[in-house]
């Protein structure tokens, strides 16, 4: 399993349907890059100027929306993940 460092978060993207409402199957080239995912792991937090560690606001299991082109894609044990900074996360979905 991945253990992110600092203020980084590991996300598993949630893919949208591959077919439109009218039944057209979308090729990979026409699909939007996912912007929604589930938090798999979180780092220990960022270090403030005074040396204190500030905990992250997101936690494992949170469903989040993130910036479209944020982070680095990694593949571990045939699973694809996205490693990004907490600041690239736009919102937690209730």
From Swiss-Prot:
InterPro entries cross-referenced by the UniProt entry: Chaperonin_GroES, Chaperonin_GroES_sf, Chaprnonin_Cpn10_CS, GroES-like_sf
Coiled coil segments of this chain: none
Species: Brevibacillus brevis (strain 47 / JCM 6285 / NBRC 100599)
GO biological process assignments: chaperone cofactor-dependent protein refolding
Keywords, in A-Z order: Chaperone, Cytoplasm
Gene3D superfamilies: GroES chaperonin (2.30.33.40)
Cellular compartments annotated: Cytoplasm
Recorded GO CC terms: cytoplasm
Name of the gene: groES
Assembly and interaction partners: Heptamer of 7 subunits arranged in a ring. Interacts with the chaperonin GroEL.
Short name of one Pfam family: Cpn10
UniProt name for this protein: Co-chaperonin GroES
Lineage: superkingdom: Bacteria
HAMAP family for this protein: CH10
GO molecular function: ATP binding; metal ion binding; protein folding chaperone; protein-folding chaperone binding; unfolded protein binding
Family the UniProt entry places it in: Belongs to the GroES chaperonin family.
Function: Together with the chaperonin GroEL, plays an essential role in assisting protein folding. The GroEL-GroES system forms a nano-cage that allows encapsulation of the non-native substrate proteins and provides a physical environment optimized to promote and accelerate protein folding. GroES binds to the apical surface of the GroEL ring, thereby capping the opening of the GroEL channel.
């Amino acid at each position: 399993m991945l253990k992110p460092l600092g203020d980084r978060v590991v996300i598993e993207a949630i893919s949208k349907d591959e077919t439109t409402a009218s039944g057209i199957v979308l090729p990979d080239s026409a699909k939007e890059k996912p912007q929604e995912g589930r938090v798999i792991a979180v780092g220990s937090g960022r270090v403030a100027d005074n040396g204190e560690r500030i905990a992250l606001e997101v936690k494992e299991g949170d469903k989040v929306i993130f910036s479209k082109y944020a982070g680095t894609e990694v593949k571990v044990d045939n699973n694809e993940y996205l490693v990004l900074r907490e600041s690239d996360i736009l919102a937690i979905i209730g």
